[in-house]
Amino acid sequence: MRCPFCRHDDTQVVDSRVSEDGAAIRRRRRCSACDKRFTTYERVELNLPAVVKKDGSRTEFDCRKIVASMQLALRKRPVAADAIDAAVARIEYQLLATGEREVRSEKLGELVMNELRGLDTIAYVRFASVYRRFEDVSEFADVIEEFRRASPAKTPRKR
């Protein structure tokens, strides 16, 4: 690795350690020319696919946008931030597992909806109403009916 001080190509690793979070390797290096020391970090590079929008334009995948849209759908709902982070991690994993270089925004929206379905039904309906551009109350009723068919009838709890 090239020395950042003198630009010499010959450096030696003096010490290597795994970072506290386990996501990187920290290496202390020494330049054989100027004898200065510096630190480098080695991390896994994840190549998430580019997002192809409805108009055909392409943009980098940004997990912050997914988190923000999920937080908006989950606003004032009893869902922990850790659950949102875990859902986003599952979405990223699914995207990486495809091996594709691009993902259509529609597919990404479906992945978000599937995660919200498991987290909170109200948030799912909120997100679906915006994502699918509901224009009529009957569309809300259709989604609610979907849930009723998918989940078995619950017996009311005694108070």
From Swiss-Prot:
Its cofactor is Zn(2+). One of its GO terms (molecular function) is zinc ion binding. Residues 49-139 form the ATP-cone domain. Keywords: ATP-binding, DNA-binding, Metal-binding, Nucleotide-binding, Repressor, Transcription, Transcription regulation, Zinc, Zinc-finger. The keyword Translocase does not apply. A zinc finger (unnamed) spans 3-34. The keyword Metal-binding applies. InterPro entries: ATP-cone_dom, NrdR-like_N, RNR_NrdR-like. GO terms for biological process: negative regulation of DNA-templated transcription. Binds 1 zinc ion. Belongs to the NrdR family. Negatively regulates transcription of bacterial ribonucleotide reductase nrd genes and operons by binding to NrdR-boxes. PANTHER family: TRANSCRIPTIONAL REPRESSOR NRDR. This is Transcriptional repressor NrdR. It comes from Burkholderia orbicola (strain AU 1054).
